[in-house]
């Protein structure tokens, strides 16, 4: 199972060193209302600076991103007050990796520090996204690190969803209908996606 991480240049040792321990004195399993908002965003700002200076990140041949303060604030406002801090701020550092299938990724769940979110068949409230996310968390005082795994087939569609659907805050059903069309080969490229989106949004029955 460790080979899955090693393939991308990751290891438990590296993920441990990339794990930031909160100095707020509160378990990150606690809901957001237990935290002082100014304190938590001051800490997130420190985390961003810490990752910016972490040279080993630049050496990885793997896509990664450090979550912006603005994005973290939006997520906070969306989930305050009754969501756990560790689940709201579970992607301050996020990696993206491609895989041939999800079976090998799911076995990462055997690693004690890793929690798996299996969306390979969709989310509970299906919006068309497909993938498996692994969350490495060293302890309840450490912020999780997210690793997103997608097949190439799913990554292509997910990218179109993100570009054209998510930021416009359309109903989840729009993404799901487009996903069904993608799986039925009615969408094969980005132009097809845009054309199909127009029809779905206008609810064109004849498409």
Residue ranges of predicted features:
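An acidic, glycine-/histidine-flanked metal-binding catalytic module
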Residues: 1-46, 148-207
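Short low-complexity stretches enriched in small and charged residues
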Residues: 12-18, 46-57, 98-107, 191-193
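Short, charged/polar, low-complexity loop and linker segments
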Residues: 76-90
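Long beta-strand-rich cores associated with HINT superfamily self-processing modules
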Residues: 86, 91-93, 98-189
């Amino acid at each position: 199972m460790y080979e899955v991480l090693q393939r991308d240049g990751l290891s438990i040792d590296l993920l441990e060193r990339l794990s930031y321990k909160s100095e707020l004195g509160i378990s990150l399993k606690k809901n957001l209302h237990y935290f002082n908002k100014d304190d938590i965003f001051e800490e997130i700002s420190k985390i961003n600076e810490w990752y910016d200076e972490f040279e080993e990140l630049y050496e990885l041949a793997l896509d990664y991103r450090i979550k912006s303060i603005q994005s973290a604030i939006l997520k906070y406002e969306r989930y305050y007050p009754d969501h756990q801090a560790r689940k709201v701020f579970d992607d301050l550092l996020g990696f993206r990796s491609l895989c041939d299938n999800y079976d090998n990724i799911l076995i990462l769940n055997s690693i004690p520090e890793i929690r798996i979110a299996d969306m390979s068949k969709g989310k509970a409230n299906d919006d068309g996204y497909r993938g498996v996310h692994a969350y490495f968390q060293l302890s309840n005082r450490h912020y999780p690190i997210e690793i997103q795994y997608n097949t190439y087939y799913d990554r292509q569609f997910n990218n179109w969803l993100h570009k054209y659907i998510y930021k416009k805050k359309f109903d989840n059903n729009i993404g799901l209908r487009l996903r069904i069309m993608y799986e039925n080969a009615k969408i094969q490229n980005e132009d097809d996606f845009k054309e199909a989106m127009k029809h779905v949004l206008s609810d064109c029955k004849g498409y």
